[in-house]
Regions:
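General beta-strand structural signal in soluble alpha/beta enzymes
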Residues: 7-9, 66, 88, 119-122
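Short amphipathic alpha-helical segments at helix-loop
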Residues: 57-61, 87-90, 118
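N-terminal glycine-rich anion-binding loop in soluble enzyme alpha/beta folds
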Residues: 6-72
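Active-site histidine-anchored catalytic micro-motif
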Residues: 91, 96-138
Length: 138
């Protein structure tokens, strides 16, 4: 059955990027910073990313994460709205404030795209639970 809307999520979904592509689910990537350098949570697209991350940990370097900001959500959502209505299942508000930025961006875009539907859902779960929720919605 073909969906009548675009389903999107964040890279914290704990599913392989190839799986997300096969299900036609756009992903918004979180980032982390080590020693002032920003890295993308690329969901395994770069084969060196995970070994690099673990080398940081082994060296005692603690990666710092941050929320996805409103501007990043605006850009991501707008690109999806050009194609159709959007349901974004966000990473849990219990571990990140990003969902609040997603809601703020959605409100701004609803004014710009009054004929489009943009719904942001707080998954209230993380890791594999988040992945299962997105998979079920797909």
């Amino acid at each position: 059955m073909e969906r009548k809307f675009i389903l999107s999520c964040c890279s914290t979904v704990d599913l392989p990027y190839s799986y997300m592509q096969s299900r036609d689910i756009p992903v918004l990537f979180y980032t982390y910073v080590v020693d002032g350098q920003e890295y993308v949570d690329d969901m395994g697209r770069d084969p060196e990313a995970l070994p690099r991350f673990y080398r940081f940990l082994e060296a005692g370097k603690l990666p710092q994460t941050s929320q996805i900001n409103v501007g990043t959500y605006l850009d991501f959502f707008e690109a999806q709205l050009e194609k159709g209505d959007l349901l974004h299942i966000a990473f849990t508000s219990g571990q990140s404030g990003s969902v609040h930025n997603a809601v703020a961006a959605a409100k701004l875009l609803q004014e710009k795209y009054p004929d489009k539907k943009l719904v942001v859902i707080d998954s209230l779960c993380s890791s594999s639970g988040y992945g299962l929720l997105v998979d079920y919605a797909a």
